[in-house]
């Protein structure tokens, strides 16, 4: 997995050219120097403002970068969000999410279904089903399953459930 940022396009491309990985998951973790998992990212922002900022950054990264095969945990922003209702309602961000998905389809990129949502209380993989279905409606064909494992015990965590989720 490679964290994508708008100011490292050249470096990311060079890194993947000189290190011929079999497969690269691109993702957005840091925006304007602040990690989305940190409280500071959300400080002073409404949920709508924070989530829009996140999705706009994902769109920018998806468009600028070519060094990835699939985009990972597309609705990750809600994992650490401090809001009482931290869910991502696809309809609230439809325009920008659709632009992200269209960009992936046009570039021949895929979407990674990430099972970490089961470990972190979402009760489902990332992205949510509405986003996955919309990706398919827009012509998306490449879907992978990943566990975002940071420990050996989490490798392939709930892949069976994720497989059924993708088939639904």
Which residues fall in each region the model found?
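Extended substrate/RNA-proximal surfaces in nucleic-acid metabolism proteins
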Residues: 1-106
């Amino acid at each position: 997995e490679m964290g994508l940022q708008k100011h490292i396009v050249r470096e990311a491309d060079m890194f993947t050219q000189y290190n011929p990985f079999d497969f690269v998951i691109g993702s957005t973790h840091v925006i304007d120097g602040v990690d989305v998992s940190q409280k500071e990212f959300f400080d002073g922002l409404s949920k709508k403002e924070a989530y829009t900022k996140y999705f706009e950054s994902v769109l920018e990264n998806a468009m600028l970068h070519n060094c990835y095969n699939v985009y990972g945990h597309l609705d990750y922003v809600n994992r650490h969000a401090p809001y009482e209702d931290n869910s991502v309602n696809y309809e609230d961000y439809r325009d920008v999410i659709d632009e992200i998905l269209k960009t992936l389809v046009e570039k021949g990129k895929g979407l990674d279904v990430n099972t970490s949502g089961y470990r972190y209380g979402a009760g489902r993989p990332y992205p949510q089903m509405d986003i996955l279905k919309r990706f398919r409606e827009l012509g998306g064909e490449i879907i992978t399953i990943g566990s975002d494992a940071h420990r050996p015990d989490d490798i392939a965590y709930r892949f069976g459930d994720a497989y059924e989720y993708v088939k639904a």
